[in-house]
Amino acid sequence: MSRVYNFSAGPAAIPEEVLFTVRDELLDWHGIGMSIAEVSHRGEEFIGVAEEAERDLRELLAVPESYHILFLQGGSRLQFDMVPMNLLANHKKAVYIDSGVWSNLAIREAKNYCDPHLATNAKELNYTGIPDQATWDMPNEAAYFYYVDNETVNGIEFPFIPDTDLTLVCDMSSNLLSRPFDVSRYGLIFACAQKNMGLAGLTIVIVHDDLLKRSPLPTTPSYLQYALHAKERSFINTPPTFAWYLAGLIFKWVKNQGGVAVLAERNQRKAAKLYKFIDKSNFFDNPINPTYRSRMNVIFRLADERLNSLFLKEATENGLANLKGHRLLGGMRASIYNAMTEEGVDALINFMGQFEKRHG
């Protein structure tokens, strides 16, 4: 079997050990004569899978007991609506940071429900970093403070948790489980699974119990109410059972790797060596302020963009897949989530060096 190094931004690479487990269990899960994909979501087999996945995630992230962990459908984009629907309550204002493509989309959705107040706008820096926090325009009162921890398209990542007394809401879709952080600083965190936690179709929400007491907007459908999902333990209807199962396997994999802190060190090494190569090169360029460079999504351009197609063609021929940049920005993007090995990053750097020698 020959597998390539997959640098896709999402759906993204899944650890091989996890894929082997899925293969071995697919037809007969734990001797029951059925696949876990075939069992009832309310049967004891899947209930056990679901409860174990939640316990493991709570342990990995040190999630306090005062938080519910929800396993939802709809992707992260649905959270752009669910957050204001559930958290605005009597407020007319919510604070947002525009740090790139995904935060901008969230801001657009929020305008359907409130007056989004921009604390700062990275557009002023051409989305190459975040303006200094001392310059942010912060109101004294608002329903919540929303930001995207890692912008997958723009290649920007927050190296700190914003300092605010407002309820923090964070989109961690592309870097949850990639580094330790203090969950208790947040009111709500959400992340789609297809970056670091498996399959598209599952979104994880970690929400403080106090926020579940807020009254949703009157027009909020019952299915979009966090409190109801919490009450029903994410079983209002049939959840994405196979994606939930796979996420649970990945949580086990993270534990077997030594936990989130061990992965954080590995992720830092992977990103550092790739950025170091790009910075030394006269052929490749990354425009992001080093302080805000993403460890998960490394964007770069070729000095001669007429060579883009050739670069991608030769990369694919060398077992390096899905390096094409997002359609809005162009260029290249290497997504190096938890499942990407250091050997994969080394192979990419070696190929880039050889390509530069031939065409630089």
UniProtKB/Swiss-Prot annotation:
Keywords: Amino-acid biosynthesis, Aminotransferase, Cytoplasm, Pyridoxal phosphate, Pyridoxine biosynthesis, Serine biosynthesis, Transferase. It holds the Pfam family Aminotran_5. Pyridoxal 5'-phosphate binds at residues 102, 152, 171, 194, 237-238. One of its GO terms (molecular function) is O-phospho-L-serine:2-oxoglutarate aminotransferase activity. Its EC number is 2.6.1.52. It is found in: Cytoplasm. This is Phosphoserine aminotransferase. L-glutamate binds at residue 42. The modification N6-(pyridoxal phosphate)lysine is found at residue 195. Belongs to the class-V pyridoxal-phosphate-dependent aminotransferase family. SerC subfamily. Its cofactor is pyridoxal 5'-phosphate. Its main location: cytoplasm. The gene is serC. The lineage of its organism: Bacteria, Pseudomonadati, Pseudomonadota, Gammaproteobacteria, Legionellales. It is an enzyme of class 2 (transferase). Binds 1 pyridoxal phosphate per subunit. GO terms for biological process: L-serine biosynthetic process; pyridoxine biosynthetic process. Homodimer. It comes from Coxiella burnetii (strain RSA 493 / Nine Mile phase I). The keyword Zinc does not apply.
